Design a protein with these regions (language model features):
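N-terminal low-complexity, acidic/polar interaction/targeting segments
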Residues: 1-194
Length: 194
């Protein structure tokens, strides 16, 4: 079904409705799909032995109003959903939050061993705060229900806060792992000297 849907999208406007599943199955039914997803444009497509890999560019949050199946794949009637931006995005507290998540996201990328210039190139490519929160959320390892929760958080400020918490948690995890590694190395060094 998914391959047929991709083929159909490629023949028309290249738009798909990307939505997460509650259960991992090859043939999803509407009842296991979350209602909110993203209208996305198919960018690159790579076909390989393991199937098809797509690069999707998210364009707009949307909610599925109705699903139907025709020609072997599922289609959806969707309604776009607007995010809630702060009344004043030059509010000092909002600007500070946006700056903090940018700095912590860069730190996380570098701690994961990515080259600094690559991290900054990716992060600097998005200036709009809501899109930035979405970009960072895409790089964070989270269970599907948590990622879905971020997608459904329409307040940009709240989404930035929630993503920042996840980023800080992952930095803390990496710090703890580095600490454990260094303790193990120390113990190994002491044992070798004995």
């Amino acid at each position: 079904g998914t391959l047929r849907a991709i083929e159909a999208a490629l023949k028309s406007d290249r738009l798909v409705f990307a939505v997460a599943q509650r259960d991992n199955t090859d043939e999803p039914t509407p009842d296991i799909l979350y209602s909110m997803g993203v209208i996305a444009r198919i960018g690159q497509i790579q076909r390989g032995l393991g199937g098809v890999q797509l690069l999707l560019q998210g364009e707009q949050r949307a909610t599925a109003l109705q699903y139907s199946t025709s020609e072997g794949y599922m289609t959806a009637v969707v309604m776009s959903v607007e995010e809630m931006t702060p009344l004043n995005d030059h509010d000092p507290a909002f600007e500070a939050l946006h700056k903090e998540i940018r700095e912590r996201a860069a730190e996380l990328g570098e701690r994961r061993g990515l080259p600094e210039e690559v991290v900054h190139q990716v992060l600097d490519s998005v200036t709009e705060p809501g899109r930035f929160a979405d970009l960072v959320a895409g790089y964070i390892e989270l269970p599907v229900p948590e990622k879905q929760g971020l997608l459904e958080t329409l307040s940009v400020e709240e989404r930035l806060r929630r993503v920042l918490v996840h980023v800080q948690r992952q930095i803390g995890l990496l710090e703890a792992q580095e600490e454990i590694k260094s303790q193990v190395q120390e113990e190994l060094g002491e044992r070798q000297r004995e």
